[in-house]
Amino acid sequence: MIIGLTGGIASGKSTVVEIIKDARYKVIDADQLVHDMQVKGGRLYQALLDWLGYGILLPNGELNRPKLGQLIFSSEEMRYQSAEIQGKIIREELAAKRDCLAKEDDVFFMDIPLLFENDYQDWFDQIWLVAVSPQVQCQRLMKRNHLSAEEAGMRIASQMPLAEKLPYASLVIDNNGNIDDLKKKVKGAIKDLANLV
């Protein structure tokens, strides 16, 4: 059984992943995979360099991630081009990791932030969605990424609205509360999952 885990930016998905890992389930992390491929010499690093040029690099040759984020989130056209350029490479790498882990484990998770936006839903037996209110999401994103309200709003607006994701979720994990509430909900879901398998 493969479970997709998703949620909007700053929804608390990373905390949910840690709780799942503590329960001894393996999690393929799409963001980490992307990060690894964006290091100097990686597949995405080269694709981004070919697309945007050397202006996106720091003096040491690494990607200037804040600048890259500003460029990509500056317009719908830039987001679309980024998805086109990076999406195919990411999908190939995630599929390879999924297929490899499926040979070892009967149950595992894949943490994919843009699961619905990039049409990954057919990959999964279940989809767990971490949900927060727009106000909580904006506050967390501003604090975590040191963004203005306008910058945070642009990033949130670039993702599919929560209401459109809800019908596709097997489980919705409400994360408007505190960490203890979240742990209780996720541990309960993991217990239910163990009873299914």
Swiss-Prot record:
Transmembrane segments: none
Entry keyword set: ATP-binding, Coenzyme A biosynthesis, Cytoplasm, Kinase, Nucleotide-binding, Transferase
Main location: cytoplasm
Record GO biological process: coenzyme A biosynthetic process
EC number(s) given by UniProt: 2.7.1.24
Similarity comment: Belongs to the CoaE family.
Identification of the protein by name: Dephospho-CoA kinase
